[in-house]
Amino acid sequence: MAVSNLKSPVPNFEIEERLVFIPTEEFTKKFLENCIVSEVAYLYPYDSESCKESTTTTRFRKRNGKCTLTVKTSDGDKNTDASRYEREIEISEEEYEAFTKKLFKMELRYYKDENGYEFKVFGNPEKYQIKVIVEKEFDHEITAAEQIEMTNYISKLGHDVYLVTKDFTFNVSNQYKNQMK
């Protein structure tokens, strides 16, 4: 029931000049083998009508082969149990893949952390957040060209992709520029 009512918000970000980089077959293969969508979350902002910081988070998780959907709400009063509601249900891998593919249509930013390479995806950050973990260990410091290869591959799936690192920022998707004018 909660699932059927979910709607993907319209991505809200400016179109910038695109850079194009064709990924090598070897790199794309390695990337695909190590790319998993581990968590998808809708984050709904406060309820302005009631003036309460009411939030609803619908979160998809995939861990150890088990896919779950969790719906959690809060009306902003952290002192009462009645103000919070949480329910988790197990969903099939097919349902999980269908939802994550449908939702994966927004700005993508790239970060590196101690656990691997983490892609955090934002469309309208006030509405929702999608996080994609790329479990990939490189035997060398990842280069700018390799980072472009990664994000360019994702852009071929039909998403507007941004790559952000500590040292530089790229927007590497170009195929939908004309359609969006």
Predicted feature residues:
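Phosphate-end processing signature that detects enzymes handling 5′-triphosphorylated RNA
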Residues: 1-181
